[in-house]
Amino acid sequence: KKTAGLNERVVTEEGYQEVKKYLKLLLPELTKDNRKVIFFVPPMTKYLYAAYSSKLKSDFEEQIVLFLEKFENVEFLDLGCDSHFTDDDFGDFEHLNHNGGIKLTSILSEKLINSQRKENDA
């Protein structure tokens, strides 16, 4: 609850505007030459995920995720409550352990490879 509470205080309208300002500056450069950019919410324990308010989740969706959809070659992946992860994948209440890190890397790699295959098939 403490981490979720801290994030709720940090994530304000001004904070969202600041994030969007920097994304507008960075994304054109990052996606140059048809490069893919993936933003993701990392996996969370069920306890941490439950501690985040529904308002925080919906505000993030409205402010950031919808904003990212405006850009070519930018994807968003929400792994916050992804079923691939269990409590055994965490070293504490919010950080992945070694096995969890391997699992996350595998999921992200697969996403990039599949995205590239789709592009090559088009």
Spans of features found by a protein language model:
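A structural motif corresponding to the C-terminal end of an alpha-helix
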Residues: 24-37, 67-76
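Structured catalytic/translocation cores of nucleotide/phosphate-coupled proteins
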Residues: 19-23, 39, 104-112
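Second-shell loop/turn segments in exported
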Residues: 9-16, 49-54, 90-95
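Generic detector of short, locally flexible boundary/turn motifs and exposed helical patches
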Residues: 2-6, 40-44, 68
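Secreted/periplasmic serine-hydrolase-like ester/acetyl group-modifying domain
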Residues: 1-33
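Active-site segments of SGNH/GDSL-like serine hydrolases
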Residues: 27-53
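C-terminal regions of proteins
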Residues: 55, 59-122
